[in-house]
Regions:
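C-terminus-biased signal that marks the final domain/tail of proteins
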Residues: 1-188
Length: 188
């Protein structure tokens, strides 16, 4: 859902999909206005709620949360329990969560860095987000997200088997995810 919606750079009216490869260097300069696509410079979050079936414990519900500009952030699973990971919790230093602040900083420095007046601040540098070399920000973060999901999957499966979320195990998972995200250079 995140890839197909929150990070979609397809426009059916214009009949373009930036991911097709037809809009990368050397075919184009790689600059496009964000207003033609779902993710916008002003987008601050995207969530997907993974609920439970009737009769299942509601605490097994997960809110997959992308804080900041979705193309420059990663989805973090959050459970309806005490204690959220620090990376998604508000910090006065950033006036946001560290993950949101890092995502927005990356977007400002690498995606929306063309500011010559007259609305140019809405131009996104597509080549930095997604390129034919596979080194774009979104391409690298998709791999990080997949690795995070592989870390989360055993915990999810164990929680479903038990019918509940163990808070100590959840705290350990959050710590591991936060360490992993830091190791990827997404956080200080």
């Amino acid at each position: 859902i995140f890839t197909d919606l929150a990070r979609s750079f397809r426009n059916n009216i214009l009949d373009i999909d930036l991911r097709s490869g037809n809009f990368n260097y050397p075919k184009t300069a790689g600059w496009f206005t964000d207003q033609d696509f779902i993710p916008r410079k002003d987008t601050s979050c995207s969530i997907v709620v993974q609920g439970v079936k009737k009769g299942e414990n509601p605490e097994l519900s997960i809110i997959w949360t992308v804080l900041g500009y979705p193309p420059t952030s990663v989805a973090v699973p959050l459970w309806v329990k005490n204690n959220l990971p620090a990376m998604v919790s508000y910090e006065k230093e950033y006036d946001a969560s560290p993950l949101s602040a890092a995502s927005l900083k990356l977007a400002k420095e690498k995606v929306f860095h063309y500011n010559q007046g007259g609305g140019t601040s809405h131009y996104l540098h597509w080549e930095n987000l997604y390129n034919l070399k596979g080194t774009g920000i979104m391409q690298r973060l998709m791999k990080v997200e997949e690795d995070m999901y592989q870390q989360v999957l055993p915990f999810m499966e164990a929680s479903y088997r038990k019918g509940k979320v163990d808070q100590k195990e959840l705290d350990m998972l959050y710590k591991g995810l936060e360490d992993f995200v830091k190791a990827q250079g997404l956080l200080k």
